[in-house]
């Protein structure tokens, strides 16, 4: 994230940075390993197990990837999303409707409204994981957070834990659910269509989730 060159045609990286991709996964969908790793990191840090009930707040790329990661772990997961097309994507990956309190609430938005909603759906002693970036500061309902001893994890994208990289687990998620790309990647463009691709990605009315450049499109 801190090194220039992400838009270059070629990049040299250390071999240790490479992750093997299952042959069932379309190469053009391999870009989903990155947002999946963001989701995995939050679950790894909170030691999430298959008996934990998960709520995902936000139906963008990270939110929908978090649903996939939760399903990979064997968890029951529900989604709160703003737009109908995001709710539909969540349903396709097995998410239900937000209801009650949860062992893990994953806020993939990070604004005041979603943080308040997230705290309201946290069980006493549960984890609130911040995958969305609160650009204007973190404003949590103080009394409820303290009285219920809600643990808050600000997550720094991804890393490795006990020698296992989040990217490696993310690649396994993609291998188990190779059709994730059809759900999350809503728009594909050639490199020549870059201006339109960025326009669609920024347009809230385009019903986009993940917009990518696909080298197979000419």
Question: Predicted segment positions?
Answer:
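Glycine/charged-rich beta-loop-alpha catalytic/anionic-binding loops adjacent to active sites
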Residues: 17-27, 100, 151
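Glycine- and other small-residue-rich loops at beta-strand/loop junctions that grip anionic moieties
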Residues: 10, 31, 55, 59, ...
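C-terminal substrate-binding/catalytic core of Rossmann-like NAD(P)-dependent dehydrogenases/reductases
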Residues: 138-186, 195-196
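Mid-domain Rossmann-like dinucleotide-binding core that forms the NAD(H)/NADP(H) cofactor-binding site
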Residues: 26-99
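Glycine-rich phosphate/adenylate-binding loop and adjacent beta-alpha elements
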Residues: 1-18
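C-terminal capping/lid region of NAD(P)-dependent oxidoreductase domains
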Residues: 56, 72, 129, 133-136, ...
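A general structural signal for well-ordered alpha-helical segments in protein cores
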Residues: 8, 18, 39, 102, ...
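Glycine-rich cofactor phosphate-binding loops and adjacent beta1-alpha1 units
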Residues: 46, 53, 87-151
């Amino acid at each position: 994230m801190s090194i220039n060159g992400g838009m270059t045609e070629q990049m040299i990286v250390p071999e240790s940075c490479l992750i093997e991709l299952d042959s069932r996964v379309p190469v053009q969908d391999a870009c989903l390993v990155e947002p999946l790793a963001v989701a995995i990191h939050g679950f790894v840090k909170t030691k999430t197990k298959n008996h934990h009930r998960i709520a995902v707040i936000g139906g963008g790329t990270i939110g929908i990837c978090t649903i996939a990661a939760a399903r990979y772990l064997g968890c029951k997961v529900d989604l709160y999303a703003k737009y109908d097309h995001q709710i539909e994507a969540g349903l396709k990956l097995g998410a239900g409707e937000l209801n009650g309190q949860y062992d893990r609430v994953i806020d993939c938005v990070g604004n005041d409204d979603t943080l308040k909603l997230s705290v309201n759906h946290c069980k006493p002693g549960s984890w609130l994981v911040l995958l969305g970036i609160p650009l204007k500061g973190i404003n949590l309902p103080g009394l409820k957070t303290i009285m219920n001893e809600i643990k808050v994890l600000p997550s720094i994208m991804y890393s490795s834990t006990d020698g296992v990289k989040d990217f490696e687990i993310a690649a396994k998620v993609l291998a188990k659910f190779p059709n994730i790309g059809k759900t999350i990647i809503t728009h594909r463009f050639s490199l020549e269509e870059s201006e339109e691709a960025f326009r669609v990605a920024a347009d809230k009315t385009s019903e986009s989730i993940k917009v990518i450049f696909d080298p197979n499109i000419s």
